[in-house]
């Protein structure tokens, strides 16, 4: 919280608001409602608790706005909106470092970095490097062309790569403007050297990425997940990584997060968590 809100421009924040920079949880609000009844603005981030409309009206009657220093507000926003409280999200700003991180991993993965870095022996590393195609003319798959997916696509335009996209909701005209080719989910996995997941976070996308897709990946391909861990059938991914020693997985997210103690992800050298 303090890193997000009270770092570079703390003085600006304090000029606008009489800021209390303590960190509170939902239990604090419910146990001492009198301390929060004059609160007009709330600053939160990942882990924002869910309040009912009744709890908001009873404990935060003067609340005007919630500032959420992260992405999606779907989990908690509706009761606040129904009470007339405005909700602001940093979803666009939050997407920038995610897109930058994604592109960096794609470039490194296409060069075989994540495999070769494990070898102190230069000859072995060089032999492994040769199994990877590099970044010139390579196919990269993007699953989900939402805000972050589009950011990644635009940043990849600086490279000579062919970008294949799976997104049923991406208009053909937008795909043409982005210079990408729309294909099926199966084609993304079977034709691309790196597959990067940016699916929307909802019930329909849970478990969408399964073993059949991972098994169809190209030799020495890489799966990169910065979307949501629950969108991957992780038992399938573990099985395929075990059966296919040529594949690599870069997992910025898992489910649960972090993986449970003893998870195979910690033991598979080609899974970077």
Report residues per predicted region:
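Phosphate/diphosphate ligand-binding glycine-rich loop within oxidoreductases
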Residues: 40-119, 132
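A short helix->loop->beta-strand "cap" motif at the edges of active sites that frequently abuts
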Residues: 59-65, 82-85, 160-161, 219-221, ...
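Phosphate-coordination loops involved in phosphoryl transfer and adenosine-cofactor binding
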Residues: 63, 136-139, 211, 220
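Glycine-rich NAD(P)-binding loop of Rossmann-like domains
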Residues: 115-151, 158
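Conserved small/polar residues in nucleotide/adenosyl-binding loops
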Residues: 271-273
């Amino acid at each position: 919280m303090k890193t997000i809100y009270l770092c570079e421009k703390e003085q600006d924040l304090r000029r606008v608001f009489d800021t209390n920079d303590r960190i509170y949880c939902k239990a604090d609000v419910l146990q001492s409602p009198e301390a929060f009844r004059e609160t007009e603005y709330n600053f939160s981030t990942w882990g924002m608790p869910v309040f009912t409309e009744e709890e908001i009206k009873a404990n935060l009657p003067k609340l005007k706005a919630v500032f959420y220093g992260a992405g999606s507000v779907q989990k908690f926003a509706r009761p606040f909106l129904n009470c007339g409280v405005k909700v602001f999200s940093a979803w666009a700003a939050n997407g920038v470092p995610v897109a930058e991180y994604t592109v960096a991993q794609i470039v490194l993965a296409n060069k075989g970095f994540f495999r070769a870095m494990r070898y102190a022996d230069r000859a072995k590393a060089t032999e492994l490097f040769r199994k990877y195609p590099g970044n010139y003319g390579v196919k990269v798959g993007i699953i989900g062309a939402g805000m972050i997916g589009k950011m990644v696509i635009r940043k990849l335009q600086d490279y000579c790569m062919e970008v294949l996209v799976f997104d049923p909701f991406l208009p053909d005209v937008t795909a043409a403007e982005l210079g990408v080719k729309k294909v099926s989910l199966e084609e993304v996995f079977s034709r691309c050297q790196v597959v990067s997941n940016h699916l929307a976070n909802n019930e329909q996308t849970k478990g969408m990425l399964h073993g059949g897709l991972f098994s169809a990946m190209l030799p020495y391909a890489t799966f990169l997940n910065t979307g949501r861990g629950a969108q991957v059938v992780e038992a399938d991914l573990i099985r395929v990584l075990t059966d296919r020693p040529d594949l690599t997985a870069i997992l910025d997210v898992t489910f649960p997060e972090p993986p449970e103690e003893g998870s195979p992800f910690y033991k598979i050298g080609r899974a970077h968590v």
